[in-house]
Amino acid sequence: MRVVILGSGVVGVSTAWYLAQEGHDVTVIDRQPEPALETSAGNAGQISPGYAAPWAAPGIPLKAIKWMFQRHAPLAIRPDFTAAQLCWMWQMLLNCDARHYKTNKARMVRLAEYSRDCLQQLRRDTGIQYEGRQGGTLQLFRTEQQYDNATRDIAVLEEAGVPYQLLTRHELASVEPALANVAEKLTGGLRLPHDETGDCQLFTRQLAAMAADAGVTFKLGRHVRQLRVEGQNVTGVQCDDEMIVADAYVMACGSYSTGLLRQWFDIPVYPLKGYSLTIPLADDASAPVSTVLDETYKVAITRFDRRIRVGGMAEVVGFNTDLNPKRRETLEMVVRDLYPHCGPIEQATFWTGLRPMTPDGTPLVGRSPLKNLYLNTGHGTLGWTMACGSGKLLADILSDKSPEIEANDLSVERYVR
């Protein structure tokens, strides 16, 4: 079957790889000259199934109000009063209760765990290299309340069979030695030993090269103008002056998927702006071993080979991609506080990207209201964590194979009535 994939980020390229493995004739289209130049370019680098959780959680509405008056708040909202923003925020608010949180986190962990397994199998099959580490991830708590609140997530982890370790402040240095110097600032941590890290952009480009060798065609530097639809079927993709025709189509354009589909149906995918710093590594002993996640500021600090990636923040500001110096201040503050000697922070590169977020945190993976159009978008802050699993799942669905995990609750049907 001829399949066109819109988007060459980590989700689109992973989907292309798995579809090619099923024998499909795959073409990937993207407006950028190379794969992984937008949201996949500078993310935090963590592959963290156990930390997969929706931003819509009990207490978030009240926290959001408090964060409005804090200098280093992890979430900032700039209302533009557009229907898209207001509708998305209202739907998110409706998911901020304990029942929805438990349901949403459980299915996110299910997909993320599956994705981690798919990545490990891909690594065994291909030997792909992307500065990956299998050292687990560590969530750091600065208050006793954060430490106590971890029991809510631990219950979901236990139900999903995800191994974990709840550590006191004195045990943190046993897994992240450099934290010994700042232990007095922390109350403890939650460690997930099976989580991983790696450079998402490097992975995506390596996988794209392997996909090309497997027969996937990449049409890069092509702007998708619109879908051509007749009845309930997509009949082509208009790119500049070229119409590209296939038997099936996959929408993997992240936050931009919403606008391309709006003429036919709405999907609740909205951009959540994030930031990162990439710092040259100066001292191994003063740097993290893997990934640590500061729960207070929602900032992750990840070790690559000779670089440190510091990523986080969330701004609800539409499609604005300006670099906000205040966000750099927050990222620098967190890394200076925890790893002050890891590298020359003043030499860091500063990046921003738009994560495609759904109100309930779960991506849209599967069929759409158009018969031959499939969705693989809305992964939010977890695109790298969920990419391989989402790609394999979508390839199975499109190929009329039974998915290896429950997938019905991942489709857009939970929103489109």
Curated annotation (Swiss-Prot):
Its cofactor is FAD. One of its GO terms (molecular function) is D-amino-acid dehydrogenase activity. This is D-amino acid dehydrogenase. It catalyses: a D-alpha-amino acid + A + H2O = a 2-oxocarboxylate + AH2 + NH4(+). GO terms for biological process: D-alanine catabolic process. InterPro entries: DadA, FAD-dep_OxRdtase, FAD/NAD-bd_sf. It comes from the Bacteria. Oxidative deamination of D-amino acids. Belongs to the DadA oxidoreductase family. HAMAP family: DadA. Its EC number is 1.4.99.-. Pathway: Amino-acid degradation; D-alanine degradation; NH(3) and pyruvate from D-alanine: step 1/1. Keywords: FAD, Flavoprotein, Oxidoreductase. FAD binds at residues 3-17. It is an enzyme of class 1 (oxidoreductase). The keyword Oxidoreductase applies. GO terms for cellular component: cytoplasm; plasma membrane.
